[in-house]
Regions:
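N-terminal subdomain of nucleotide-sugar transferases
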Residues: 1-43, 49-54, 80
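Short glycine-rich, flexible loops that bind phosphorylated cofactors or substrates
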Residues: 12, 63, 92-94
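Short glycine-/acidic-enriched loop or helix-start segments at secondary-structure transitions
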Residues: 15-16, 47, 95-97, 120-123
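Residues at the C-termini of beta-strands that transition into short coil/loop
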Residues: 41, 58-62, 102, 113
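A short, charged, and often flexible helix/loop element on the N-terminal side
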Residues: 50-76, 84-87, 123-132
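Structural alpha-helical scaffold elements that stabilize or flank donor/cofactor-binding regions
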Residues: 77-78, 139
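An aromatic- and histidine-rich active-site surface loop
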Residues: 84-119, 136
Length: 140
């Protein structure tokens, strides 16, 4: 099986999502599967060069949201090359773009929130929660 992980960044300074991708990918590769990453990193980023997996870097993503006009066309052109898609993280452009392309092609995918829906955030950051609550119906 050929798996594509879609994530904002492969930079380990971004926290746990990339570590989760690498750990899961290690297991999947040991089982004989092929794993690539689609990210919003700049292609010349050190983290992209150092990554043990093939990284299709479509960035740099702009601002906190990470918009890149390269991500959707790349995914649209290459989606048929993969058997499974895992969107890692929410609330940013990579998840919106991946959902949009994959839904238009009627391709199923997995969404791994990496704790981003934890109720703790709702109470710890009420204004961010309100913003995300308004974004959810059309963005995710």
């Amino acid at each position: 099986m050929k798996i594509l992980h879609i994530i904002r960044s492969v930079n380990p300074e971004g926290g746990g999502p990339i570590e989760g991708v690498l750990q899961l990918s290690s297991i999947k590769r040991a089982q004989g599967h092929s794993v690539d990453i689609l990210s919003l990193d700049s292609p010349d980023c050190e983290s992209v060069r150092a990554c043990e997996l093939t990284v299709h870097a479509m960035g740099p993503g702009l601002g906190l949201y990470g918009y890149s006009n390269k991500l959707k066309p790349w995914l649209d052109a290459h989606a048929q090359d993969y058997d499974a898609f895992i969107i890692n993280g929410i609330w940013q452009y990579h998840s919106f773009a991946a959902h949009s392309v994959l839904k238009s092609k009627n391709l199923p995918y997995y969404l791994f929130t990496h704790g981003m829906m934890d109720p703790w955030f709702k109470y710890q950051y009420p204004l961010k929660h309100l913003k995300k609550w308004l974004y959810w119906p059309w963005g995710e």
